[in-house]
Design a protein with these regions (language model features):
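Active-site beta-loop-alpha junctions enriched in small/polar residues
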Residues: 1, 29-31, 105-109, 171-175
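A conserved hydrophobic secondary-structure block that centers on an alpha-helix together
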Residues: 2-27
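Alpha-helical packing segments of well-folded alpha/beta enzyme cores
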Residues: 8, 12, 85, 89, ...
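Conserved, mostly hydrophobic/aromatic
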Residues: 16, 100, 168, 211
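Carboxylate/His-rich catalytic cores and anion/metal-binding grooves
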Residues: 20-35, 102
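An active-site-proximal structural segment forming one wall of the substrate-binding cleft
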Residues: 21, 89-107, 138-167
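Aromatic- and acidic-residue-enriched carbohydrate-binding clefts of CAZyme catalytic domains
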Residues: 32-95, 110-147, 176-195, 201
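Conserved small/polar residues in nucleotide/adenosyl-binding loops
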Residues: 215-217
Length: 217
């Protein structure tokens, strides 16, 4: 939700090393922002890494306004790590015996990804209005969704060392968007299932299978 600079992350790693903590979980994506360069999807960082600064006061997610275009002059708060910067963080952490664990939040908490790439949004969802009211879950029926996730995983594989864990989030997944989405309902019929939760299970299984297929034993 809030971007931490390279210097701040390194200072955290130094503190972790001092107290013999050996895993740094980086929450790189969430509704209010996407923080890692993905070369195949440049709008993730050109748009969804930046937002209009909020007025001082209590944090309110529904007031967040992400950049509506590249170089949006009003969206000046935020930032992201280039792939080279992330490699630098990983090397810095490794030299202090700390493992960096990247988290890419899916299928829920995906407002930032959906904001940049509308093909991830379910049919019938009034985005972005409903996206800030719990309908921030990517579509389970569109083929673009699985392709997107696989592409992101492919790039993570080039950044992180072999055998590095990848966290896929999968928390607080709202199924409401899937209920009236023609693509999700079509996928549900293919699975011969009635429960919307089956879509989430199927998605996670497909992603996990893909990640495992990349492991060379």
């Amino acid at each position: 939700r809030h971007f931490f600079t390279m210097a701040e992350v390194k200072r955290m790693i130094d503190t972790m090393s001092l107290f013999k903590l050996n895993r740094l979980h980086l929450h790189l994506t969430d509704g209010p922002g996407w923080r890692l360069e993905i070369k195949k999807y440049p709008l993730l960082t050109a748009m969804s890494a930046w937002r209009v600064p909020l007025a001082s006061g209590e944090w309110n997610w529904q007031e967040v306004k992400l950049a509506i275009q590249e170089n949006d002059p009003e969206a000046t708060y935020g930032g992201f790590y280039t792939q080279e910067q992330m490699k630098e963080i990983i090397a810095y952490a490794r030299s202090r015996r700390v493992t960096v664990v990247p988290e890419i939040e899916l299928p829920g908490h995906a407002y930032a990804a959906m904001h940049a790439y509308g093909e991830l949004v379910c049919d019938g969802v009034n985005f972005p209005v409903e996206g800030k009211k719990g309908r921030d879950t990517v579509c389970m029926g569109r083929p673009e969704t699985l392709r997107f996730v696989k592409d992101v995983v492919d790039e993570l594989k080039t950044i992180f060392p072999p055998g590095s864990p990848i966290h896929l989030g999968h928390d607080e997944v709202s199924t409401e968007s899937w209920r009236n989405c023609k693509y999700c309902q079509s996928r549900l019929k293919e699975l011969n299932e009635n429960s919307l939760k089956a879509l989430g299970r199927d998605f996670l299984q497909q992603v996990a299978s893909y990640v495992l297929s990349l492991i060379h034993i």
